[in-house]
Amino acid sequence: MRPCGSVCQHRHFRHAACGTQPLPWRTTAPEPGAPPHEHLSARRKIHSVSPEYEERTSRLPGAIGWVQGAPGCTGGGETTTVLPDGCIDLLWTAGRLLVSGPDTSAYSTHRGFWVGVRFSPGIAPALLGIPAHELRDQRVDLADLWPGAGTRRLTERVDGGGRTRPPPSRIWHCGVAADAEPVDPLLRAVVVSLEAGRSVTATADSVGLGARQLHRRSLAAFGYGPKTLARVLRMQRALRLARAGVPFAETATLAGFADQAHLARDVREMAGSSLSELVER
């Protein structure tokens, strides 16, 4: 895991109490035909999924809870690779609450016991009260975003004294600013358009924004400009196709790459591995 940065220590946000009504987490699979980014499957985020991994999809759009490992598990020094997917995660591990920002390249982190909530692109910044570009490529302690004793108390309540596995819903409530703004539906439209392979220009036109406006909104909501988000989503489309057994040449065409060589370059640059290596893991 990259060292946690110190981000926006001058900002102060109110916190939602951890004791509020828990979210309706469920362990059912997504509806057939649902867009891949709705489910936010861990196979997009973590491509080495252990038998101890459990996902909990939520009726709240754009969020999924997950647990990996068991209390006391240290991972034995093993690591797992996290790929860029445009998402932001709120994480709990070893008594710490962390925010994992949107990534532009793959990184390795230790296994062990993790509990988290993953938010699809554009969801978390409004809930956390922090622009996504300030979290890009970082793993940040929640206390650095929300300074003060309140964050420490919230962490202790999520931890539960170390006796039990903290549910994702408890982490959710401890990581949402009480004055959080509602998520702009325009952001969802941007993601859907780019996920479908539309160009940045066509996407901007479809939501009624100019190129500069879209870029500015994208930095705050997704952590990077629309071209980078489109590139990340395109790589994820290719991974889903390749893992489903689609030949690489056909995968390149269906995912929106110019050719198979273009696909290979993009995957190597963002994931640090070849497409065949990712599929085999």
Swiss-Prot record:
UniProt KW DNA-binding keyword: yes
Regions recorded as binding DNA: 201-222, 248-271
Gene3D superfamilies with a match to the protein in the record: Homeodomain-like
UniProt cross-references to PANTHER family, sorted A to Z: BLL1074 PROTEIN, HTH-TYPE TRANSCRIPTIONAL ACTIVATOR RHAS-RELATED
PROSITE patterns: HTH_ARAC_FAMILY_1, HTH_ARAC_FAMILY_2
GO biological process: response to antibiotic
Region (Disordered), start-end ranges: 21-42
Keyword tags: Antibiotic resistance, DNA-binding, Transcription, Transcription regulation
GO molecular function: DNA-binding transcription factor activity; sequence-specific DNA binding
Domain HTH araC/xylS-type stretches: 184-281
InterPro entries: AraC_XylS_family_regulators (IPR050204), DUF6597 (IPR046532), HTH_AraC (IPR018060), HTH_AraC-typ_CS (IPR018062)
Protein name according to UniProt: Uncharacterized HTH-type transcriptional regulator in mcrB 3'region
